[in-house]
């Protein structure tokens, strides 16, 4: 089933599949004009191309199918908790197009078939959703729902901790403030003991 059908992808804007380098360069050039700069001066002459290439990388998650990331399964008959902690994460706030960064902690209880996915695939899934214009709450839920969709686990728990530079560099200007979001699915939502065990392991330093 497609992730659009599961509500894991936004339908508000048609998803483009090819990055438009030329259009991005023109937009950055116009932005430089708008702030009163000369995009043709020595220090800025190549900036539109550089920023466009950076955007292609920073937003590469828009052009990757999440279904292809969790494509490696192992029949390990494992039925206990799997946790990957402290996954470094860099994303871009969709409100100001400024970075937010931190760590993601991913835990899941394999389904009845005992199948698990590769640990690197979990990190790649975090990267895929982080490399989009995002809000932290949606990012957290998208990771959880993608794992549910692909792995059919008994439970999923996600905790994301991040500093938002839109709070540190501008506006309220509170550097060091950390936002924590979580998403729980399945057994972790219905069983308080399972949820407490997972959170204890995730938050233990």
UniProtKB/Swiss-Prot annotation:
Zn(2+) binds at residues 93, 96, 166. Transmembrane segments: none annotated. It comes from the Bacteria. One of its GO terms (cellular component) is cytoplasm. Pfam families: GTP_cyclohydroI (PF01227). InterPro entries: GTP-CH-I_C/QueF (IPR043133), GTP-CH-I_N (IPR043134), GTP_CycHdrlase_I (IPR001474), GTP_CycHdrlase_I_CS (IPR018234), GTP_CycHdrlase_I_dom (IPR020602). Pathway: Cofactor biosynthesis; 7,8-dihydroneopterin triphosphate biosynthesis; 7,8-dihydroneopterin triphosphate from GTP: step 1/1. GO terms for biological process: one-carbon metabolic process; tetrahydrobiopterin biosynthetic process; tetrahydrofolate biosynthetic process. GO terms for molecular function: GTP binding; GTP cyclohydrolase I activity; zinc ion binding. It is an enzyme of class 3 (hydrolase). Toroid-shaped homodecamer, composed of two pentamers of five dimers. Belongs to the GTP cyclohydrolase I family. HAMAP family: FolE. This is GTP cyclohydrolase 1. The gene is folE.
């Amino acid at each position: 089933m497609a992730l659009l059908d599961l509500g894991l992808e936004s339908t508000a804007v048609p998803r483009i599949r090819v990055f438009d380098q030329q259009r991005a360069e023109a937009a950055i050039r116009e932005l430089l004009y708008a702030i009163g700069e000369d995009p043709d001066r020595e220090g800025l002459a190549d900036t539109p191309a550089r920023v466009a290439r950076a955007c292609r990388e920073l937003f590469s998650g828009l052009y990757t199918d999440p279904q292809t990331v969790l494509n490696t399964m192992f029949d390990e008959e494992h039925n206990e908790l799997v946790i990957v902690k402290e996954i470094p994460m860099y994303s871009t706030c969709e409100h100001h197009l400024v970075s937010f960064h931190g760590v993601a902690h991913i835990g899941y209880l394999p389904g009845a078939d005992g199948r698990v996915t590769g640990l690197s695939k979990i990190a790649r899934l975090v990267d895929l959703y982080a490399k989009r214009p995002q809000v932290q709450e949606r990012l957290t839920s998208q990771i959880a729902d993608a794992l549910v969709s692909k792995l059919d686990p008994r439970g999923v728990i996600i905790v994301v901790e991040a500093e938002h530079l839109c709070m540190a560099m501008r506006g309220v200007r509170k550097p060091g403030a950390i936002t924590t979001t979580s998403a729980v699915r399945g057994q972790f939502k219905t069983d308080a003991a399972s949820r407490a065990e997972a959170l204890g392991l995730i938050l233990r330093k």
